[in-house]
Amino acid sequence: MNPRGKVRIIAGEYRGRRIPVAPKPDLRPTPDRVRETLFNWLGQWLDGLACLDLFAGSGALGFEAASRGAARVVMVESDAAVFESLEKFRSLIGAQAIELVRGDALEYLKRSRERFDVVFLDPPFRQNALPDVFRQLPGAPGTRVYVEAGEPFTPGAPWHELKRARAGQVSYQLFEWRSDDQGGLPGNV
């Protein structure tokens, strides 16, 4: 974690703003270098796109997406103190594109069924939540999913890995739903 308890937004409207990180042992804010790589993979700007930050944590990915022009960013967080920190920062910067949802990530997917252009998945490593998330994640051709985990993850068809890298103890990957595999995973048709 950042020693000062803050992580900075790299580019866009909120560039240079520092997101306060709640003092929670399980929070691992995505480092600047990894976020820079991710947004290079995504094409830097997310103008007009709908994004989901399913395990929001520090909010680094969701706030960065909003800063880079995403039309809508839904950030889901279950921890009350972390959620409160996200709310305060959203109000401070006036990020109208961000919708905060307090609750369980898997329950959100069961209820919402909304499709997003870009999904950020950085669950606590010990939860092993990725298989369940991918089973429930509504996708469509072109949907991109960023995964941050302790080890590389393979979700299977219709998801195709576009990029993969490693930074220290973290593996990060970018997947895309490909239309040549119509039918998809259970619950994603």
PLM region spans:
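Class I S-adenosyl-L-methionine-dependent methyltransferase catalytic core
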Residues: 1-189
